[in-house]
Every structure is written in C-alpha cells, then in structure tokens.
From Swiss-Prot:
Protein origin, superkingdom: Bacteria
Protein EC: 2.7.1.148
Record flagged with keyword Kinase: yes
Binding site for ATP: 96-106
Underlying gene: ispE
Keywords annotated in UniProt: ATP-binding, Isoprene biosynthesis, Kinase, Nucleotide-binding, Transferase
Residue positions of the active site: 13, 138
Record protein name field: 4-diphosphocytidyl-2-C-methyl-D-erythritol kinase
UniProt-listed Pfam families: GHMP_kinases_C (PF08544), GHMP_kinases_N (PF00288)
One function term, GO molecular function aspect: ATP binding
Pathway in which this enzyme or protein is active: Isoprenoid biosynthesis; isopentenyl diphosphate biosynthesis via DXP pathway; isopentenyl diphosphate from 1-deoxy-D-xylulose 5-phosphate: step 3/6
Keyword Disulfide bond: no
Enzyme class: transferase
Length: 283
C-alpha cells in the first residue's frame, strides 16, 4: 500500500551576504547572494485525497487561502502534471512572515517536493525548481536544498560550502515590505559583482541593511544588541537579524541574554536542508 500521508519540515534560510548590482528593465534587481539553511522551520503535513480538491486547513491572518503560496504551489503542480489527486494540508507555523528567512518560499518548496512524492509524479529537481521560480525567486534554492551562491534575481544557483556555525536569530516584531525596501531611493544598486568562488569572507555585506535600519528602529535595535557579541547581519530585507557562534553553548548563552527583551531562537546552519535530508530518508 502506498504512503498516503506525509509530514515534512520547511526550513528557514539566511542570506549570508546580499549585493545589489543594478535594476533590470522589468523592474527586478540583479542580485548576488549566498543562501544557507537553518535546522529550524515550519512543519507541513499532507494527506492525499482522491477527489482532486486542494484544501489548506490552517488559517493565516490577513492571507486569503488562494493567495497562500502553499495553495498556489499545489494548484500549479496539479495543473501542470494533470494529476487527478487532491491534497489536505496542515501547517505548524513558527517562521515569521516578512522576516527575510524564507517562510513562504520554503512552504511552497516543501509543498512541491511533498506532493511530487505523494502523487508519484517523478519530476526531477530541475523541473520542480522551474515551476518554483514562477512562485517566487527564493523558491528554487529550497527545492534544490543545498547552500548556494545565487545570481540574477536569485534563481541562478551554484552550490557553496560555507562554514556551518550555530546562529542566534533575533525576530523584531515588525514585518518588512520587500517592495518598499527595493524602491527606496537611497538603496545601493551598483555593487561590483563578485567573480571569485567560493565567496570571499570579507564580502558579507547586505546592501539592504542601511535602508532597513533607517526605516525600522526595531531592526536597528536588534542589530545593535546582537552586535555587542558578534557581527550582526540582516537576512534578506529583514526583519530578522542573525550572528554566528562556534558552539551551541555560546549561542545559547547570548540568546538567553537577548531574548529577555526580544523574540529569537538558536539554530544550526546547514548546507543541506533538513527537508532534503528527510526526503532522502524516505527513499
């Protein structure tokens, strides 16, 4: 009997650096960024149904079901594969929305990979990543599941192998609008491209940080507090702020001091996502 239910992780990501090279004619920005995963994230549970209905059973405040990337991913995969089956989906949500750690994109990728497995479609990662790109620029890296240097709008991926420290991640209670940051006139848009691999350690700058810190005092405060213990960085356009530590004990110690006033968590960096490790264990 085939497996009809499946629970999969939906990991967070960090942008270890983010350089903006310029704006394209279509309005998108040319980027260079380095993605790494965290062993921390949401959890999605899927149950196959035979009537073709796609049903997300978890409510998201302010997000209509049909606008949710989970539902969009499921419907696109169903349509493009001509699959007659449907799916029930539940999510245990812990990743913040608008945090810059890839919550929605990761959920979409977990949905594509989970349904590909449950519906027995046999799609490879290239095909799933191409579909994922139509949902968002960050979806392909979650589909492929390996730390990567990304170019273009974030979709041209080259595997990378950065160190895997323990991270303290702070979550300022504010949702940052990516569109707002990328339209800010003071945003740096002319960083010279990095042409050396692996990415040199000195290139850890995030071009969005000055704009986000100026617009959002909550983010600026988190950067200042974490910066007392380690180099504090912004992931994506925020709002989440992170810093690396060589051991869990050190990360836990700093986190305990900071989370008295700020929300945050400790997680291990990983160059292979916990989603892909789980899928490999099912083979």
């Amino acid at each position: 009997m085939s497996v009809q239910t499946l629970t999969l992780p939906s990991p967070a990501k960090l942008n270890l650096m983010l350089h903006i090279l310029g704006r394209r004619e279509d309005g998108y920005h040319e980027l260079q960024t380095l993605f790494q995963f965290l062993d921390y994230g949401d959890e999605l549970t899927f149950a196959v149904r035979d009537d073709g209905v796609i049903q997300l059973h978890t409510e998201f405040e302010g997000v209509p079901h049909d606008s949710n990337l989970i539902v969009k991913a499921a419907k696109k995969l169903q349509a493009q594969s001509s699959c007659p089956l449907g799916i029930d989906i539940w999510i245990d949500k812990i990743l913040p929305m608008g945090g810059g750690i890839g919550g929605g994109s990761s959920n979409a990728a977990t949905t594509l990979l989970g349904l590909n497995h449950l519906w027995r479609l046999g799609w490879d990662d290239d095909r799933l990543a191409a579909l994922g790109l139509t949902l968002g620029a960050d979806v392909p890296v979650f589909v492929r599941g390996h730390a990567a240097f990304a170019e273009g709008v974030g979709e041209k991926l080259t595997p990378e192998y950065p160190e895997e420290p323990w991270y303290v991640v702070l979550v300022p209670q504010v949702s940052v609008s990516t569109a707002e940051i990328f339209s800010d006139p003071l945003l740096t848009r002319n960083s010279p491209p990095i042409k050396v691999r692996p990415v040199p350690k000195g290139n850890s700058r995030n071009d969005c940080l000055p704009v986000v810190a100026r617009r959002y005092p909550e983010v600026r405060n988190a950067l200042n507090l974490l910066g007392k213990f380690t180099e504090a960085k912004l992931t994506g356009t925020g709002s989440c702020v992170f810093g690396g530590f060589p051991s869990k004990a050190e990360a836990d110690k700093v986190s305990a001091l900071l989370t008295e006033t700020l929300t945050g968590f400790v997680a291990k960096g990983s160059n292979v996502s916990m989603l892909h490790r789980k899928l490999q264990s099912l083979l």
